[in-house]
Amino acid sequence: MMIKNIIIITFLVISSVLPAQANFNKGMKKAFEYWQNGNTDEAENMFERIAKAEPKEWLPSYYIAQINSLKSWNEKDEAILKNQLDKAQEHLDLAMTISEDNPELIVMQAQILTNWVVFDGMTYGMKYGAKISELYAKALELEPENPRATLCKADWELNSAKYFGKDIAPFCEEIEASVKLFDTFKPESEFHPNWGKERAVVVAEECKA
C-alpha cells in the first residue's frame, strides 16, 4: 500500500511539473523570437511575465538585466541610463538570490558596472574599475573555461591598456583564447547564455590589424 501511495505521489508531482516546464519553455522561446526580430520591448515584457510566473528560474531576470545593459551602451541621457541600469541591477540582484556564485551572473554584473564607466570614465572609472576586474577574476575562478568571462575580462583589460598606452599583446592572446573556448562551449540548455563569439572574433581581428 505504501509503495502504491509513493507511486501516486510521484506521478502527481511529475504531472504538475511537466506543464509548468512546458509553459516556461514556450514563454522563453517566444521572448527570444521577439528579441531576434528586433522587438526588444516585447521581449523584455515577456521575460518579466515569465520571471513572475517562475520565481525559481534565474534566466528571465538575467535577460531583463542584459537587455537593459545592452540598451545602455550608447545612451547619452543620464536619466534614461540610470533608469535602465537601475532596472538591470534590480533584476540581476533577483537572479543572484536564485542562483548564487553563478559565473554568468557575475559577468553580467561586471557588464552593468562597465556601462557606467563607458558613460562617464572620469566619474565611474575610479569607482568601479577595480571591482570590475575582481568580478571577472571571480567568474573565471568559478568556471575557468567560461568563454564570456574570458572574453569580457580580456576586452576590459585591453581597452584599459589602450587608454593608458600599454602593450595590448597579452590581452589579444586572451581574446584569441576566448574564440577557441566559444568553439567548444556547450550551453546547459537552449535558453542559457551563449552570446559573445561575434564580439570575440571582431576584437581578435582588430588585434591583427
Segments (PLM) and residue ranges:
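Start-of-domain marker
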Residues: 21-69, 76
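Terminal, low-structured helical/coil segments at or just beyond the last alpha-helical repeat
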Residues: 169-173, 177-209
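Short coil/turn linking the two alpha-helices of tandem helical-hairpin repeats
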Residues: 70-79, 110, 115-124, 159-165, ...
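Helix-turn-helix repeat elements of alpha-solenoid scaffolds
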Residues: 34-46, 81-91, 125-133, 172-179
